[in-house]
């Protein structure tokens, strides 16, 4: 969860890439409609482009399933889609472990909101609680029992909003759109960025006046962890190819590994890196550009 452009989609695609490597079937549910196949390909997602007679890309195929707002326009439709796939899996028609990847909770309303032509947050939260908290989340947890033939996982991006302080000496709080049902059922919650702002800084590659975004540095915090029990906070560097540790050796290694990519964008491998922006008041870690 987190504000816009803080690394959430990067984390989701990394999960999908690793799922493919493990033989797990990624199931994309894209209701945010900011999906980029090119970005996914850069990060290592495996798929084939399907072209028409004129050479135009009309579809994509591979070891994954994909659905978006073309068919999923409400919380209930997302839930039915997931439930149908789990049923097909139980019948043996989808003989894979599945990793559902939803981008994002808070981007679609509930059926009642649509029928009433009002995007009511309380109705949406109620639908999330009914469809997921009391139903699908439990099915996913039950798939982790030893006697279950398949194991399913849900990785979801949750849109957020900032609640103002309740009193003059209070602090603003980050709240999930769609209510707290997913928070309560989650085994791992990661927050990217800060409470009141994105909490990122841009790292630009500069050569002869040309500026290209090289990466972003973002705050990250493990707010809930029922897997290893460890909660921590720090910073990571996100690039178009995935995450990097926040240190100079890692970014130098990345720069060298993708030199053809940067040569194409910048026109040279001899460029300067300049960091711009303010990560706010979170703990300072060594600057990766030092």
Please annotate each region the language model reported.
Residues 24-124, 128-131, 277, 282:
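Conserved inter-motif catalytic segment of the P-loop NTP-binding fold
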Residues 1-2, 29-32, 157-159, 192:
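Short His-Asn-centered micro-motif
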Residues 125-243:
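Phosphate-binding/switch region of NTP-binding enzymes
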Residues 18-22, 47, 85-95, 140-150, ...:
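Conserved catalytic network of the ASCE P-loop NTPase/AAA+ motor domain
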Residues 51-62, 202-206, 249, 253:
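Surface-exposed intrinsically disordered loops and tails
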Residues 233-290:
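NTP-binding/hydrolysis catalytic cores, primarily Walker-type P-loop NTPases
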Residues 15, 39-42, 78-81, 85, ...:
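Alpha-helical scaffold elements adjacent to nucleotide-binding pockets in ATP/GTP-utilizing enzyme cores
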Residues 1-23:
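Glycine-rich P-loop/Walker A and Walker A-like loops and their local beta1-loop-alpha1 context
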């Amino acid at each position: 969860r987190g504000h816009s452009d803080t690394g959430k989609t990067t984390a989701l695609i990394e999960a999908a890439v690793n799922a493919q490597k493990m033989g797990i079937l990624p199931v994309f549910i894209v209701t945010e409609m900011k999906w980029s196949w090119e970005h996914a390909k850069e990060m290592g997602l495996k798929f084939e482009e399907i072209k028409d007679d004129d050479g135009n890309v009309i579809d994509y195929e591979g070891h994954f399933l994909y659905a978006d707002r073309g068919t999923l326009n409400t919380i209930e439709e997302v839930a039915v889609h997931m439930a149908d796939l789990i049923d097909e899996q139980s019948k043996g028609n989808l003989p894979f472990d599945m990793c559902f990847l939803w981008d994002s909770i808070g981007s679609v309303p509930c059926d009642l909101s649509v029928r009433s032509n009002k995007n009511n947050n309380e109705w949406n939260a109620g639908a999330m609680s009914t469809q997921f908290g009391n139903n699908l989340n439990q099915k996913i947890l039950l798939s982790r029992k030893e006697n279950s033939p398949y194991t399913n996982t849900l990785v979801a991006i949750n849109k957020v909003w900032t609640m103002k302080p309740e009193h003059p000496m209070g602090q603003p709080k980050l709240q999930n759109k769609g209510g707290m049902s997913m928070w309560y059922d989650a085994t791992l919650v990661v927050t990217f960025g800060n409470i009141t702002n994105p909490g990122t800084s841009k790292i630009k590659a500069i050569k002869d006046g040309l500026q290209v975004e090289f990466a972003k540095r973002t705050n990250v915090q493990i707010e809930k962890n029922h897997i290893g029990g460890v909660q921590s906070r720090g910073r990571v560097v996100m690039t178009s190819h995935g995450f990097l540790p926040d240190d100079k050796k890692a970014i130098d290694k990345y720069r060298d590994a993708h030199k053809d990519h940067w040569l194409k964008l910048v026109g040279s491998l001899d460029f300067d890196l300049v960091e711009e922006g303010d990560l706010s008041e979170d703990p300072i870690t060594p600057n990766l550009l030092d």
